[in-house]
UniProtKB/Swiss-Prot annotation:
GO biological process, one term: prostate gland epithelium morphogenesis
Functional description taken from the UniProt entry: Transcription factor that is involved in embryonic development, establishment of tissue-specific gene expression and regulation of gene expression in differentiated tissues. Is thought to act as a 'pioneer' factor opening the compacted chromatin for other proteins through interactions with nucleosomal core histones and thereby replacing linker histones at target enhancer and/or promoter sites. Binds DNA with the consensus sequence 5'-[AC]A[AT]T[AG]TT[GT][AG][CT]T[CT]-3'.
Molecular functions (GO terms): chromatin binding; DNA binding; DNA-binding transcription activator activity, RNA polymerase II-specific; DNA-binding transcription factor activity; DNA-binding transcription factor activity, RNA polymerase II-specific; protein domain specific binding; RNA polymerase II cis-regulatory region sequence-specific DNA binding; sequence-specific double-stranded DNA binding
Classification via Pfam families: Forkhead (PF00250), Forkhead_N (PF08430), HNF_C (PF09354)
Protein name from the UniProt record: Hepatocyte nuclear factor 3-alpha
Comp. bias intervals (Gly residues): 273-289
Name of the gene encoding the protein in the UniProt record: FOXA1
Biased composition (Low complexity): 322-332, 351-366
Modified positions (Phosphoserine) in chain numbering: S307, S331
Disordered as annotated region, ranges: 269-392
DNA-binding region: 169-260
């Protein structure tokens, strides 16, 4: 059994601060040395004397320092040692009476810690200055278990106050699902923003808290999803705020009426002349949506053939087939004038085939207007076959190029277009077309076969800086 002792203290405040931590100690006193320590109380000559107590107040392990022990000492003393201590040390301590020794033994017992009373303080002549310090030092140890229990109880109460209560579970629906449910249940199939808020709060009590947070998300979902359309108020329905309804072409966005997961994302086709309309961003659970479904105005369901770029390429191809062949009077100035429409190629490509486009007088001008907008659009592999301009850094003589993979008739048709396109791209304004290229009108009208060797050695190798068989 070991007892621990705190040393080097001058004032009462120092001792109180030392014993705030019950695990702090410097040295230990064996229980077997207790009687010898009590017997040597008279011969204290190391750091202090029992009568004066004027030195620094430090005690050696051989001195009587049991009154300054921390809780480990009281718990480490056996009942026999505590009971035998008063009788064995009564005769050895001249300055202490039997009552004081008894009080000391009572104070050292685990059940009587903090029982230092006025009787012991009066009987201990030498320890008088420290009698007042013993009670404050021992009392925290006496009440330590109860204090710990009280602190645990108090901590439990505080933990309950800090614990967040969830009276209602969050519904497993995205904001788009909530808006769709609210609009579909309305008799008029359209609601204002405040009515959507109210419907959600009435049906789901979870959203009655933190309203500003989720209402912002509702507004963003309405603005950034094309399936929701804003409808202006009619004169017969005065009030504040516009109505929101579902897009007529959105259809059933949710599979089998289940709002837990959206089946597909609705994407509205933007007309070239339309100025408004929602953005194309995603809101709510848009990132988790299924594959996008683009709807053609004519009702076509093929997603690869109804994009505006695809229709624009087909429209231009149809115009090229029906365009008159340029006569000998088609000078480069005329071609440049018609090629000026290439700046608006992006808007022209978005025009559907059914719309009426202004006729282009020269075929090469139409050829130049299509490839000019190619760098801003990415084409699918089957669409790149219909495109009239290839990558300038790609060799057309590559074994796996798209030209070699096409049929012979399509390849000749493609190379015929290539001649005009390359001539328009690389020839300076006002200069004549290269004489080595077969640019006669007969080659356009009759589609006469053109050998690849007639185009590549004379022109392509001089234009491209990279090798002919470059695979990049």
């Amino acid at each position: 059994m070991l007892g621990t002792v705190k040393m080097e203290g001058h004032e009462t405040s120092d001792w109180n601060s030392y014993y705030a931590d019950t695990q702090e100690a410097y040295s230990s006193v064996p229980v077997s040395n207790m009687n010898s320590g009590l017997g040597s109380m008279n011969s204290m000559n190391t750091y202090m004397t029992m009568n004066t107590m004027t030195t620094s107040g430090n005690m050696t392990p051989a001195s009587f320092n049991m009154s300054y022990a921390n809780p480990g000492l009281g718990a480490g003393l056996s009942p026999g040692a505590v009971a035998g201590m008063p009788g064995g040390s009564a005769g050895a301590m001249n300055s202490m009476t039997a009552a004081g020794v008894t009080a000391m033994g009572t104070a050292l017992s685990p059940s009587g810690m903090g029982a230092m009373g006025a009787q012991q303080a009066a009987s201990m002549n030498g320890l008088g200055p420290y009698a007042a310090a013993m009670n404050p030092c021992m009392s925290p140890m006496a009440y330590a278990p109860s204090n710990l229990g009280r602190s645990r109880a108090g901590g439990g109460g505080d933990a309950k106050t800090f614990k967040r209560s969830y009276p209602h579970a969050k519904p497993p629906y995205s904001y788009i699902s909530l808006i769709t449910m609210a609009i579909q249940q309305a008799p008029s199939k359209m609601l204002t923003l405040s009515e959507i808020y109210q419907w959600i709060m009435d049906l789901f009590p979870y959203y009655r808290q933190n309203q500003q947070r989720w209402q912002n998300s509702i507004r963003h979902s309405l603005s950034f999803n094309d399936c929701f359309v804003k409808v202006a108020r009619s004169p017969d329905k005065p009030g504040k705020g516009s109505y929101w309804t579902l897009h007529p072409d959105s259809g059933n966005m949710f599979e089998n009426g289940c709002y837990l997961r959206r089946q597909k994302r609705f994407k509205c086709e933007k007309q070239p002349g339309a100025g408004g309309g929602g953005g194309s961003g995603s809101g709510g659970s848009g990132a988790k949506g299924g594959p996008e479904s683009r709807k053609d105005p004519s009702g076509a369901s093929n997603p690869s053939a109804d994009s505006p770029l695809h229709r624009g390429v087909h429209g231009k191809t149809g115009q090229l087939e029906g365009a008159p062949a340029p006569g000998p009077a088609a000078s480069p100035q005329t071609l440049d004038h018609s090629g000026a429409t290439a700046t608006g190629g992006a808007s022209e490509l978005k025009t559907p085939a059914s719309s009426t486009a202004p006729p282009i007088s020269s075929g090469p001008g139409a050829l130049a207007s299509v490839p000019a907008s190619h760098p801003a659009h990415g084409l699918a592999p089957h669409e790149s076959q219909l495109h009239l301009k290839g990558d300038p850094h790609y060799s057309f003589n590559h074994p796996f190029s798209i030209n070699n993979l096409m049929s012979s008739s399509e390849q000749q048709h493609k190379l015929d277009f290539k001649a005009y396109e390359q001539a328009l791209q690389y020839s300076p304004y006002g200069s004549t077309l290269p004489a080595s290229l077969p640019l006669g009108s007969a080659s356009v009208t009759t589609r006469s076969p053109i050998e690849p060797s007639a185009l590549e050695p004379a022109y392509y190798q001089g234009v491209y800086s990279r090798p002919v068989l470059n695979t990049s």
